[in-house]
């Protein structure tokens, strides 16, 4: 029996390394709060708070996936039959799409630590959402997967 076909594209939007470094600032902050009470409490709270933040960041990293029938971005699912067009963006163009050129009706899956974007135009008269804007580290590959 042949294996079922897998996804055409799959990417987990993991946080960048600098996000973990930046969130490590909770360690000295919690030490400042709890060390006057107890050294042990300060150290334990610092470790527990940082671990909780790291686990939360990892557990909430969304999945972007394209298969033959669906485009999945986080918890949202879009039938590929309603995809009217796909445009990749990077650099200052991606920044403009997230900012000045953003339509308030758009559906967003944006992660600030991921520089690339793909804009997926929709052709669904029953949906007021004009497009999806999805963060990706590989905008060209995601675009190619959605166009195939």
Predicted regions and their residues:
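Lipid-exposed faces of alpha-helical membrane segments in multi-pass integral membrane proteins
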Residues: 22-26, 45-52
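A structural detector for beta-sheet-dominated domains
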Residues: 67, 123, 135-137
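C-terminal/domain-terminus segments
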Residues: 129-148
């Amino acid at each position: 029996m042949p294996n079922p076909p897998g996804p055409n594209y799959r990417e987990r939007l993991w946080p960048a390394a600098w996000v973990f470094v930046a969130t490590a600032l909770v360690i000295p902050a919690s030490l400042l709060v709890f060390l006057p009470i107890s050294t042990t409490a300060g150290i334990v709270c610092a470790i527990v708070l940082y671990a909780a933040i790291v686990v939360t960041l990892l557990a909430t990293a969304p999945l972007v996936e394209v298969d033959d029938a669906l485009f999945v971005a986080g918890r949202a699912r879009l039938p590929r039959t309603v995809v009217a067009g796909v445009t990749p963006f990077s650099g200052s163009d991606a920044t403009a799409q997230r900012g000045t050129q953003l339509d308030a009706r758009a559906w967003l899956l944006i992660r600030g630590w991921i520089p690339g974007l793909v804009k997926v135009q929709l052709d669904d008269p029953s949906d007021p959402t004009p497009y999806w804007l999805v963060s990706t580290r590989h905008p060209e590959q995601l675009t190619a997967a959605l166009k195939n």
